[in-house]
Amino acid sequence: MSRTDDRKDHDIQPELVGYKEEIFPVNKSRLTWQRDLCFLGTTQRGYEVEFDVKYEEGCSPTETLLLSIAGCISIDVVHILQKMRCEITSYEMTAEGTRQLTPPQYYKSVDLMIHVSGKGLTPAKIDRAIALSLNKYCSVYHSLRKDLAVNVKYEIEGLGS
């Protein structure tokens, strides 16, 4: 079966043409125990992630969750800004997640900071890209607890210099 056969046809917003139509409606992965509390995760496309609760040989599941939300929002924001004809020369997002101290120790809040530079960037464009990601497109964000507070700030580097 080809990749095309695995996908459902659906309407894609113009700002997302180029990557959202490549999303599978069902994702599969495999997690294999290695030793102690170390596991190897493998995606359906063969990418691997090592998990280690002791942080000696891999990351924790909560670290990858924080990276996943940062990655999902960043992919959306950069793609939407490019569709708005912005030329991004650098982009970095830092993420800080605050967790509940008692089990199940879920994330209560996530603070994200975007540092971006390039041509054609304006606060209005970045605000719009962030809003589209959070309100409509970021599947990781929309898969998490409804009471998770996600705060996104940004700095356009070199603006006004």
Model features per residue range: what roles?
Residues 72-73:
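Alpha-helical metal-binding/catalytic segments enriched in His/Glu/Asp
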Residues 2-67, 78-161:
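Extended beta-strand/beta-hairpin segments
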